[in-house]
Amino acid sequence: TTVTVRAQDDNTTPRRKALGSMALRLSSGRAEATVTVVQSPTVAPQTVVMYLPWSGNLYTHFLQNIEDVKKAVAGNILHDSRLLLFLQTSTTKGTLSELYYDNGECRETELRTYEDLDVTQAETITGIFDYIKQTAPAERYGITIGSHGMAWIPASGSGRSAADAKAGTEPAATTAPEKWHWEYVSPDGQFTRWFGDGGSRCTNTTTFAEAITAAGIRFEYILFDDCFMSSIEVAYDLRKITRHLIASPCEVMAYGYPYDLVMPYLFTDGGTEYDLDGVCRSFYEFYEQYEAPKYNCGAIAVTVCGQVEQMAKVMRLINNASPAYIPDPEKPLQQYEYLYAPTRFFDLADYVYQLCDDTALLKEFDEQLARTVPERYRLHTEYFYSDGKRPITTYSGISTSAPSTSGIVVNNIQHTGWYKATH
């Protein structure tokens, strides 16, 4: 038997409101109970969205991620906050549902189904988040995004036909197509996680920023469960729609974040706050042990987006004061992938230290980096994974594509907001 009590008026206060109690007695037998009736606030302390667009071979991993989230919710972590799940079941279909706690279990209620979805379009994404705002209004919003990732590189510029030839060499049409990083699967089935489906239906970071701006949301954090998304170019694109970026500068194993461990840190203090230290620490500690000794690889960092524009000002000074970057074969840069030739992503600080020899500017850079990517959030295992275990010798927690000679990078990077702000 289900008993539903509906209040006549909304609870416009920030806390639960006691409405009274109900005495219940079963018609058969003598069982009795008194139930306290409370009304949750109309506007939740926070709404967190788990956003899982279609990502091809990651779908089964998404289902495991959802089960891990449900384990956490069953621990009664939400209280008056809300957790919504957007899941695409194909390239064009999806559902929006709510996960909630009920008597020691996590339950799921479907809110809306979608047909003919195209989440590469800003209008579609805006529509999804407009509905989320109406359905689950909150004082603050957070989001986790699970998919394949390719940092800032535009979907239109990263298809196989564009190739990844070194800039200035043979034209793209004559170069052989190469695999994406998520197509490299080890003999025992392990692979890693472009912000999209791994095909042509991918969402540009600029499109996502445009869509969320139109929806009138500024997230407390975007947690990217994707490869390569801790990138200074990405952070600049998204700086106005989120306060923090939680992401990895390198590849993320296909398993993704351990959500049963991470999710409680997104609902601390009775569901009203979040703990970035706890998120990063739980990710790091999980991957120190994950499938050891072959796949225990993980790196994470947090970018404070309110500091990114100041970092751009410092980088402009460095670029203006420095000659063009020339690679030193004796001091190879820390790279964050070994699958694309030429490499696309390098450690930002390592690059700056080889680009610039002005002591005062380097000091200013270090100070600004500490504000932009705080050291306490920069955690990594000894190795990261990229078609095998690769050593991390220096780690600022954030990448740049500036030194790359990849045709895809060279043909597109000058159009990024970061490049324009720093040159």
What residue spans do the PLM features occupy?
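A short beta-strand micro-motif common to beta-rich folds, especially ectodomain repeats
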Residues: 3-7, 15-28
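Extracytoplasmic/secreted cell-surface and envelope-processing proteins
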Residues: 57-62, 92-95, 151-155, 229-234, ...
